[in-house]
Amino acid sequence: MSYVYETYDAGNGVEFHPVALSLPADARGEVTAYFKAVDGVFAVGADQTGATLPMYAYAADAAPAQGSLGLHFKPLASVLSLTIGEEASKTISKITLEPVDPDGVEGHLAVSEAVVDPRTGAVTVGEDAAVSDILTMEIGEMSLVQAQTVNFLIASGTKVDGGLKATISCTDGSVFVKNLFEGQEVAFAGNCVGAATELFFRLRIATYEDMVNFAQECADDNGGAIVDLQADIDMRNVPWTPVENFTGTFNGNGHRIYNINVSADGRYAGFFAYAKGAISDVVFGSKDGTSYDGTSRIELKYSADTDTWCYAGIVAQSNNTLTGVTSFVPVTVTADSRCKSRTGGIVGSLYNGKMSGCRNYGAVSNVATAGVASYVAGIAGIVDGSGDAAGAITLDGCHNHGPVMTSLGLGNAVAGITASVMKTAVNTTISNCTNAGEIRFDNAGTSAAHRIGGIVAYIVDSCPTLVIDNCTNKGTVVSNMNGNCFIGGIAGVNYAAAIRDCTNEAEVKFVQANAAGAGYLCIGGIAGQTYSGAKVTGCANRAAVSSDKLQVTRIGGIVGTHNASTIDDCSNSGDITLAYTATANNWEAAGGIVGFYDGTDGTAVTNGCTNSGKVWATVNSSNANIGAGGIAGIIKSGNATNNTNDGAVWMHNAQAGKSSYAGGIVGYDYNTKDKSAVTGNVNNGAVQATVEGTSALLAAGGIIGRNDVGAVSGCRNFGAVACALHAGALVGWNKKSVEDSAAGGSVNGTALTGTNYAELAVGFQDGGSSSGITFGEK
């Protein structure tokens, strides 16, 4: 506060004119007079501190004594004293005040420059002054281990009708919002304390009525409380309107909320509609904390149109932190819903949020008959973000135990943990999560692209910063739906993300009893399809992977379709089965590690992997591209290096005269794009290729069944090879090169020895070459 003063009456009088008003007050809340008055007399040596309440002074009508000057001091501004009550483990960094109704302000909350009439106190705003109706106090750090009071200075003459909104930002990222003086008119007339109020962030809920009041507070834009749940709450099966605009901290303290009834013909179906803050340590849908209460439900039935995104979950849409949240509540998108939907057992949509230690036991399903897109998952429907590289989204230690299902036949993804991770969800980590619920598509009469995963169904476009780490699937993953289908024990479709140290322990299958379908099927024990630099490292599949679908099929123990990505140090011990008898003209590829290497986007690599599962393919196809291998069924573009197969491989084609290729490492290397490398691999498994009747397109090899363009080197075979036409200990039918490899095992019952290995190493040299071949014995 600055003053200009003028003397008059030969120095016997002085007028003070304040010309600047600096706001807000000191963050510490200290308020003292800028110039102290002592016995009504202005003392030149008065205290002038930086923590001040601006004052103005004017001469008294009469001097109190000869030779002295009488002055009146009055506050230039009013103080809004805000006490943040009760203890909380929070540290405040910033407080913002603004009117609830921007049109309800007379004057201005903050003025940078003004002139004050010394007698009346009337404020005239300077011509170049900056004015604002938003006050921001940058505090830095203020602990709330005990109640604190801060003081804001409000320009004299200001009136606010409708109340003020206080926004408290904390150092941990949480934000609380609270309305002050709601529905009141507050006048700041130059009093020392124009208004004072307490802001209690801690709200205690012990009864149903308390919960109703809490929901109303949030609806009134007072959702910034620290909520302590102090008892189990029976929601009485009364229709519940989802809590809106919750921005605070909800401490469940291990209590339960049960008999929940949400059936929303709106965009948000959940106990909470939208939450930004933190929710922790609370159980929904259980009276005893261990089982479903039998009545709770959350239903989304938005029937207005098909082009609107809707959300369903305990928290329908979340931009917050959820810790230790458990749900037994069934979450359903109903048959009469028509919207696009994102549905999760805990969260419908997780946006820039964090989840840890959350569990779902409730069934999650979408049985709508209309709508153009659906994401359904046991924990979070989708994971999305702002695309800001500085952010981090995490799901850690979350577990789904409930079945997850959709029968909607359009644009679908369904998974145990999250149905989809969007490309804007930068720096997302999904770690230490488990799915134990069955994951199912159930609509045999519909054809549409769909993705299914035990952990994640659809990693969209390119997510190079996404990591799926140490996750396990224990629930069966199954579909019977037509169209392009991507099924994986861990992930359905993986664009560019890293999947590492994950395990699938449950069957992955497509079941449709020889029904014909268009499109192609990619099915893997870990991932249905990998693209664009995706990495699968240190993963294990321990369960059967199978299909009886009459469709183009790429089926593998680890990955179904492998394109421009890498698979390192993975293992498969589950049996791989492709079985149909009806006639078709489809590509068919089955492998212990990879079904099909696709060359669309670039070279794919499989390195250091081991298969011990049986690869068993029976088809009825007139297509030339038919292959089964201990490591890969068919290679179009890519390399297989340093892998080991211990499982039996059998390919049978029920069409006479058609193709059937089987290899201990690769069934068919037809690579139309560039030369592939098959190096350093070892086969110990039995290999057999058969066809109904006879065929000129029949080959089996210990390393490759039919090799059109592959460079085979440094490989060893010790397995038994059987084929009625072209059979070789290393390659059955060779059009390229075989070098520096060891031939052992047997061919059509003849054991290889040091004298016959050379003639049995390659079954048919069709313009190819071989050199450096040695006898292989263990």
Show where each model-derived region lies.
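Short helix-loop boundary/capping segments
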Residues: 72, 80-146
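Surface-exposed repetitive/solenoidal architectures
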Residues: 202-778
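Residue-level detector of short, conserved catalytic/binding motifs and their immediate flanks
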Residues: 31, 78-80, 164, 225, ...
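Residue-level recognition of well-ordered beta-strand positions that form the cores
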Residues: 34-36, 83, 96-98, 167-169, ...
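Acidic Ser/Thr/Pro-rich low-complexity disordered segments
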Residues: 38-49, 103-131, 177, 287-292, ...
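Short, surface-exposed secondary-structure junctions/capping segments
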Residues: 123-134, 190-203
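Short, low-hydrophobicity acidic/polar segments
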Residues: 1-91, 138-141, 145-151, 156, ...
